[in-house]
């Protein structure tokens, strides 16, 4: 890593979001005091000037503006049309949210300050712009206040949560990187809350071990994973959570010695994370594996903020309370010889003024190149018809790696550019008809002619009428009606027949006119009757006469009484349909419909026009679509064009097209889909036709290359689809979906077409078609980003050009390790205060959460540590591990006192042999060596060792005052070596009822030379050591200790056996004196585990709530600065020598199933009946189960699928068990639920090893089936 620039400020900061030259904005940090005790508060902008060789290490601000309150946090939003440099938002100490225009700040305009909003009642601790919707801003502050702002309406935010729900302060807020309406907050209460803006409620809460949360970061690639940092000095860890299993963290990152204050997850490479905290360190991690790559140079005060550059992840910045913001890079280089000499040139005169200004040296090299660097060879098509190719060149062994870049020009087809421009101009002019006619003239197939002809008809004012005419079924050409006849004779009518629909409308109120032509009185019978008052005729009649039938009299009486419904019913039963229609006209529409239905039902099987008329009358054209002969599809289409309602017309056309497509009539089906505006249906046919036409054209046109033919064919398809969308005014209803798109094949063509036109320099046209693709569609994001980068104006980069001409610099060599040395590996956390007993022969259960290989720093060949039995040490009980307690490694100590002053520089002298160095090799990420002499700066002198007043104690600077219950800031506890051959895995000892007190030290190798570390677990006393001072004080019982009297149940989170044996030789005598003793033994803890002499079986261990197990061989502890004590008595013990452990066998990969989940094609014959019965019954239950039980039904289905997967793979379930399950299934089918339940209990009790998660599903199915009718 290289320190590129330094900003001399104690301030909150943020990176500029654009891709141009990097700029940093800073605001005076709240809660900090400058070296000159200035109370001035400023917002400043800093240009890094990375391309300026004359720029020194320290920068000067390029813009500055005063503020009336200090900052807790700053965010810089992306640029937009109104704000080309983006918006800067400040979280102020006085509770205000201030916004500034970055462009105006840079130009020095007086109106750079945009707004101030004061909704918070206390300080705003954190804020962040939504990465997916930049206009949305979230702020979090004291008293649990969380507000969501729209920067376009900044004065009207809304609040998430209520004042009563969260009384603790919120310290951080972070938006999800994949889902725009999800964000998370963390605060002093120890909880992480995940919020959903759609519901404006909290959707999930994570328990951060009841420790405060200082920072949150979402996984850049996985929307369900996030990191939380803990600022507590007793638990300085980073948790990785998966929201799909929120009960416990997925991984714990441990490496900081004091609280973690900030984390930053690289958006371009999810394998890179930086964190910083109260231990003055900035560590680089791989959060996916928990591996610690290394750390940046250690500074002299707390580092409270660290952030990757959002667009150039090579750069990162770290802010600390020593008054600097350091800009650094991941690339490595050789240390400057002149700078190293300057560090040793201090004299006593300026020691106190310069000792705390120089960071401690540290370096590391990434084990693999970052994701954006992993490009050994590649090619990229540039816009404007260029292709850039880079590749490595062969070099002699031992020579630096070199690459060459070549740029060449290409052109797919010169006609494509002109054709695209001509088509876009016609679309803009709205001249769709000329486009259709042009394509009709040049059509090469019947399918293409039909498609363009239909689209031409759709352009007309009355498209349905045009479609009917295109089918050759226009109303003017309909056949004339036959001669009408009566009983008295035939009379010809020469009236012209009107179109079908017009005729239907005209006679809608007189549908029965043809039924009365058989009357003997002629057409003018009723017309001759007078309707005026007092009219009298010469035709008297009897209402009820002797000649009438009983039916006629009944109808007459019903009509006289106005009971038309009864009269109609009598006429229908007597098959007098004409009379029924006449009476129904007096009774209303319902009676008319009743008579129509009765008549059409009675004439079933009669001529087809009656059935067609019935479908039209009843608005049931689906009968025509599905049941009419498919050979008459044109007539069916004409009927739909005439009578279908607008809202039903597209679906009816689609159904008719599906019938045609099933018969193989692709062209006719395409016609129906086009008329119905079903783009998702017709586009598949067009793409198939495109591929066929492309193959034929490739065979015919031998001169053209295949891609040129493909490009022209794709151009024709895009034009066809574009015209169709304009004609039908098509709106893509699936543009907001995230999966299962019906137009996925069209989206692929859009992306491909955009690439082609962009290669010809037509970027705006490419952007137009990419906007038609959903935002979350795979492949569209890359194309959009490339267009965005191409259209973004970026400044010149002379530094990059000069870097290409610079000679290769000397590189750091690969470090040579001494013989037998193995690099240390990051270890998970240990169960605190657990002491290892002698190895046991019994093998504990396998632990899937076991730690990796043990540390090579553990001393070999020594006996396990056995504490001396004194009157103050209780017996060693056996306990069980917690549900997800810390695994072996560096544990936590008791609560440590936090002091405001930073700790003094640590002694980083390693006790082990440092690796050798050479100067002639290089690393992958070296940068050219800067030969220019660095500017003079202050440096840290070497501190003379302080003689120790105690025998056998290493000299060094005394640590700051600490709690008497804490050990010194010493080394991390090393894991043990693996067990010797022939021995069973060791078992972890039980934790002490009362944890060991500080002041009992041994010797252990310190942390590697990057920086001195701190451990939170007190060291144990050396064997045989005695104390001539007071006894240690009694400790208050912990309410969190585990208290089972019998061995607790097996726990799959127990630590790996390989980490449970601690070996080491006796350490030297001498230690920090213990605190004053109490006069009685420690009080009994009613919640603590009862002391037991035998270990728990099966690797079941109890967690200790405080620190790591005491280790033999730890260094003696230094006394507090003010202690006036003499050395304790005791003999010396030989120091253990670190020796490398034997290599560990690689763990076997997990066994893969024979067939994938969900496959049911390999179920044996003996189990097929079982699967069929259970599946059938499960479907029955699922169909009838209440909606409130849907989760239970879904879980039962999932568990039954586990059983089916086992049967399909012929694993786990034995043949005799399959027979029992067959009997159980038959009992369920016979509804013998009592027998089925007895069989289930028998299988579960006798075949436990075969019963996985599926047995619960069987049990639930029996209960649900019994309760479902």
Swiss-Prot record:
Provide ranges: composition bias, Acidic residues: 485-497
Is Endoplasmic reticulum tagged as a keyword?
yes
Enumerate the PROSITE patterns for this protein: WD_REPEATS_2, WD_REPEATS_REGION
Region annotated Disordered sits at 474-503, 792-1162
Gene Ontology cellular component list? COPII vesicle coat; endoplasmic reticulum exit site; endoplasmic reticulum membrane
WD repeat ranges are: 5-47, 66-110, 119-159, 165-205, 208-251, 255-295, 298-338, 380-408
Annotated membrane topology is:
Peripheral membrane protein
Provide ranges: composition bias, Pro residues.
933-948, 1071-1085, 1106-1144
Its Gene Ontology biological processes? COPII-coated vesicle cargo loading; endoplasmic reticulum organization; protein transport
- What are the subcellular locations of this protein? Cytoplasmic vesicle, COPII-coated vesicle membrane; Endoplasmic reticulum membrane
The molecular function GO annotations come to: structural molecule activity
Q: Matching SUPFAM superfamilies, A to Z?
A: WD40 repeat-like
Superkingdom of origin organism: Eukaryota
List the Pfam families: SRA1, TPR_Sec16, WD40
This chain's function reads: Component of the coat protein complex II (COPII) which promotes the formation of transport vesicles from the endoplasmic reticulum (ER). The coat has two main functions, the physical deformation of the endoplasmic reticulum membrane into vesicles and the selection of cargo molecules.
- Assembly and interaction partners: The COPII coat is composed of at least 5 proteins: the SEC23/24 complex, the SEC13/31 complex, and the protein SAR1. SEC13 and SEC31 make a 2:2 tetramer that forms the edge element of the COPII outer coat. The tetramer self-assembles in multiple copies to form the complete polyhedral cage. Interacts (via WD 8) with SEC13.
Q: What is this protein called in UniProt?
A: Protein transport protein SEC31
Source organism per entry reads Pyricularia oryzae (strain 70-15 / ATCC MYA-4617 / FGSC 8958) (Rice blast fungus)
Which lineage is the organism of this entry classified under, starting from the top rank?
Answer: Eukaryota, Fungi, Dikarya, Ascomycota, Pezizomycotina
- The protein's gene is named SEC31
